[in-house]
Amino acid sequence: MKTKLTEQSYWVDVQGNINLDLADDNIIKLWIEKNLDLSNINSCIEIGCFPGRYLTIFGNNRIELNGLDFIQEVKFLKQKFQENGFVAGSFINADFTTYVPEKKYDCVASFGFVEHFVNWEVIFKNHFNYVSNNGYLIIEAPNFKGFFQRLPRFLFDYKNYKRHNVKAMDLEKWKKILVENKFEIINAEYFGGYQLWNENDSKNRYFLKIKFFTEKLLFKLKDTLCPNSIDNKSFSCYLGIIAKKTNNNEY
């Protein structure tokens, strides 16, 4: 049974080369720094770490950086991080679905990863095997499930939409899984406001015109229904959870 919604070749094309550039006002970076004291963390691993930019969030706090990815170029990340003054550990070229971790880390993170699998709950739980006792887990995904996010993607970026398992974009299910496995929830929320992006590079002027007016209408409708722009599952572009592993956790 096929469990992956994307192929390795897709990620090689999309991610390209190593890239450690991450803006200071990056939404995901700000969300993590707001909700987690990084000074308590000594080591971190990112699952699906290539091209490397999100690891800089932790590296800027002198945390040892580690990563796992099935893209072969991941093996060059250690040298690149060291050249840029970061503390680098191991960078593993392996398939997360079959790899058995040899050690555990103070913090385990993945960004836009779990939703690319049919069996997303298994993938979600596999993260637990990497987390040390009293360590932290960070999981983030785009929110394609909310109406204001789902409709334009379904209409105008369907190919990319189908690369994602929308069922995985469920914060309540994430919380339930973590609580059942003896994790303490530190933060769980939809965030990022209402933003839209897509991978459809069509230049058809009729397509672009319809897309423009549809998105304009959605923005107006969102502002009417949610005038205070409070983040929620209907329109926010991201969902994320930060949790702490307790000592009595079986993983």
Question: Can you name each region flagged by the protein language model?
Answer:
Residues 112-116:
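A short His-aromatic
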Residues 1-103, 107, 111, 124, ...:
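Conserved N-terminal segment of class I S-adenosyl-L-methionine
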Residues 101, 117-122, 149:
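Short N-terminal helix/helix-N-cap motif within the alpha/beta-hydrolase-1
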Residues 166-182:
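Short alpha-helix
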